[in-house]
Structure formats: structure tokens, C-alpha cells
Regions:
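Acidic, low-complexity intrinsically disordered regions
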Residues: 1-106
Length: 106
């Protein structure tokens, strides 16, 4: 994917793909990135290494650090994300004009 194909999209995050993503299609993101994606709505357009599809923003309450340190995990969910290799690095770009998220293998 070239800079030209990113259009006016802005980088919002750099992530390492977890070992779970290829199995469940969920790419964990930060609270800040989730906040940037919220205006796109419940479902939004997604482009993963040039392949188009749809995605949803998800969140899950968690106590993985103990009950006294409850927090929330945020993620982008799509079957397209299953194509990402665990341990690979990806960059997330938000194209606000096209109302879509681009995920590009770094």
C-alpha cells in the first residue's frame, strides 16, 4: 500500500498483532484509538492491506489484573483481521472523509 492509496488518512496507532487475532478476528487497540473510531458508528468500512470489508468497534470489561484493577479492553473486530499473522506489526490509519479504517502491515 502506497502513501497515495492512504489518501487523507491519518495514522492513529501502531500495534503488534496478538496471538489471538488470527483466531478471533479481534485486534486490540488503545482507549485513545477507540475514541477516534467511535464517530464512525457501530459498523464501519475497513481496508486490511488493500482488502475491503466491514468492521465493528468492540469493548470488553476485564479483571485480568485483578478485581481491584478492573478496566476495559478495546478492539476492532472483523473476519478480515484473521489474515494478520500473530506477532506482525500493523499501522492503523483513520480516513475520516471516507469513514473507514485502514490496517497496513508495517
Amino acid at each position: 500500500m502506497t502513501d497515495d492509496s492512504l489518501g487523507g488518512a491519518r495514522a492513529i496507532e501502531h500495534r503488534t498483532v496478538s496471538r489471538k487475532t488470527p483466531a478471533d478476528g479481534k485486534l486490540e487497540i488503545t482507549k485513545s484509538a477507540a475514541g477516534r473510531l467511535e464517530p464512525l458508528g457501530a459498523q464501519f468500512a475497513l481496508l486490511v492491506d488493500g482488502t475491503p470489508g466491514d468492521a465493528a468497534l468492540g469493548m470488553m470489561p476485564c479483571t485480568c489484573r485483578g478485581h481491584d484493577k478492573a478496566h476495559v479492553h478495546y478492539f476492532v473486530e472483523s473476519d478480515l483481521l484473521r489474515s494478520l499473522a500473530a506477532g506482525s506489526e500493523v499501522d492503523l490509519f483513520l480516513d475520516e472523509d471516507a469513514r473507514r479504517l485502514l490496517v497496513v502491515t508495517a
